[in-house]
Amino acid sequence: MDIYEHKKSFMERQIRLLNRPMRPPKDWKLPLKSGQLSESVVETVFQRLQLRIQKHAKLNYSHQATQHVAAQIRKLYEQNSAIEDITFLNPLFYGEIDLSNLDSVKSLPHPWPFQKESRPVEKDEEQEKFNRLTGELLGLLTTLSELEQERSELEQIEKMLEPFEDGPSSIHTNMWKKNPELISTLNSTNTMVAKINSLLRGVSFPSLNNDNQEASLEDEIRSQLFEKTISDD
């Protein structure tokens, strides 16, 4: 049964109740002997009231009037359930939007598509309320985003300070563990220094008063180091 038939049936039942004969209750009399109304007077009052009710029902609750009221009620129900065309909106707007996401809140439509039957004053009030709440939510989410970024930066700083947690004695050990490229570079440097020291033990250092002597010493060390490297390979 649709809304029209349901409401029409309800009103017809109420009208039939109005047409039922009215009678006073059996215990309407008070236990007082003086000032009592006679039963005939009470029955006459009820009869006249019944006639007035029936006349009122006939004038105001006719079959055509009942149909008209039921149709108006159905129209109101349809208007309450119908809103403006929002097919252009994202499906998230059908009760699934994540209000904790900054991008989702920014994508909310402005102005919001309110119901068609809303009066202009109501729409303005609702729009003002919507704008205020949206602004507050955007402010909170922006602050939250900034705090999360700050936390990420602090976590990076904390990770960089991990080698210093156990004091100076463990700094070098932690740096060696955290940076394998540094280990490889230092090993190569130590090997090169050892080779140079080994070569320098057999080289006599002449006076370094002129540039030619400095150049000849440098060439000799480079030549011996190069030959030593080839022989080792």
UniProtKB/Swiss-Prot annotation:
InterPro entries: Sim4_Fta4. One of its GO terms (cellular component) is cytoplasm. It is found in: Nucleus; Chromosome, Centromere, Kinetochore. Keywords: Cell cycle, Cell division, Centromere, Chromosome, Chromosome partition, Kinetochore, Microtubule, Mitosis, Nucleus, Phosphoprotein. The keyword Zinc-finger does not apply. The modification Phosphothreonine is found at T189, T191. It holds the Pfam family FTA4. The keyword Phosphoprotein applies. GO terms for biological process: cell division; mitotic sister chromatid segregation. Belongs to the NKP1 family. Component of the kinetochore, a multiprotein complex that assembles on centromeric DNA and attaches chromosomes to spindle microtubules, mediating chromosome segregation and sister chromatid segregation during meiosis and mitosis. Component of the inner kinetochore constitutive centromere-associated network (CCAN), which serves as a structural platform for outer kinetochore assembly. Fta2, fta3 and fta4 associate with the central core (cnt) and inner repeat (inr) region of the centromere. Component of the inner kinetochore constitutive centromere-associated network (CCAN) (also known as central kinetochore Sim4 complex in fission yeast), which is composed of at least cnl2, cnp3, cnp20, fta1, fta2, fta3, fta4, fta6, fta7, mal2, mhf1, mhf2, mis6, mis15, mis17, sim4 and wip1. This is Inner kinetochore subunit fta4. The gene is fta4.
